[in-house]
Regions:
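Short, surface-exposed loop/turn motifs at beta-strand boundaries within globular domains
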Residues: 10-12, 99, 168, 205
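Exposed substrate/partner-binding surface patches
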Residues: 20, 33-35, 111-112, 116-255
Length: 255
């Protein structure tokens, strides 16, 4: 584990990078000096990994900087940067992307339509309360719910049931938690449709500062707080739970 320099409020950049540097596939890729020719972001990440953060960070800021992501100039959003990196790094997108479906069924004539899409994260619905299990948040997000004002194109009557479903399960499952009124009780091991996932990294935000909790695989390895240049090791069972968790990334474990 290594730290990253904070340049003019770039904690959000560091938090996102530390999250993906925990991916075993990312570690293997960059340890073998592999990167896509002509992809500056990919090359910068490879340099950062192999130099333990001493080379490549400034060039990375220059490569990803936009009006909404002021890397190296001001505070931005780690969650937004993670999405951006998946867009710019095809190998990362492939590791994280999965299928979802949205269905709408008329409560009167039972006509049903389904739209399908692919995404790189699953945004969880808000569940008010403290210490809400992440499994409860997932269940609520995929439960069907009524939309009384929806009008059926077939029978022209109002009232429908909408539902979101997960259609495939990627190597890395990223959950986004826009839950200001919820303290999520994470699970270190998560079973999704028979697939076993281990918690790998967690991106946190307290309203002013971003940082990451992370560990290497296999499960049972020590957790680390990765906060800019500050790297603090905790035991494997001493994950420092925080109400500031915003992105949880799970790694699919092969049986």
């Amino acid at each position: 584990m290594f730290g990253l320099q904070n340049r003019s409020g770039s904690c959000w950049v560091n938090a996102a990078l530390q999250a993906i540097f925990r991916f075993p596939d990312v570690q293997e890729r960059y340890s073998s000096n592999t990167f896509e020719a002509g992809n500056v972001i990919d090359e910068c990440l490879m340099k950062m990994w192999n130099s333990k953060g001493t080379v490549g960070l400034h060039e990375f800021h220059e490569a990803v900087r936009t009006d909404t992501m002021p890397a190296g100039l001001n505070v931005g959003d780690s969650h937004e940067l993670l999405n951006y990196l998946c867009d710019k790094l095809p190998f990362l997108d492939e590791l994280c992307r999965f299928k979802i479906a949205h269905s709408m069924e008329c409560v009167h004539c039972k006509a049903k339509t389904t739209t399908r899409d692919s995404v790189i994260e699953f945004t969880l619905d808000s569940v008010d309360g403290r210490n809400v299990p992440i499994t409860t948040c997932i269940t609520k997000t995929v439960q069907p719910y009524n939309i009384d004002e929806w009008e059926c194109e077939k029978c022209k009557k109002r009232g429908g049931i909408r539902q979101q479903l997960i259609g495939s399960f990627p190597e890395y499952m990223m959950f986004h938690l826009p839950l200001p009124n919820t303290t999520v009780d994470y699970s270190s091991i998560l079973i999704l449709n028979g697939k076993k996932y281990g918690l790998l990294s967690v991106v946190c935000y307290n309203g002013a500062h971003w940082w990451t909790y992370g560990r290497n695989m296999p499960p049972g390895s020590s957790w680390f707080v990765l906060d800019d240049t500050h790297v603090v090791e905790h035991g494997p069972k001493q994950f420092p739970v925080s109400a500031a968790m915003r992105v949880l990334i799970y790694y699919r474990l092969d049986e």
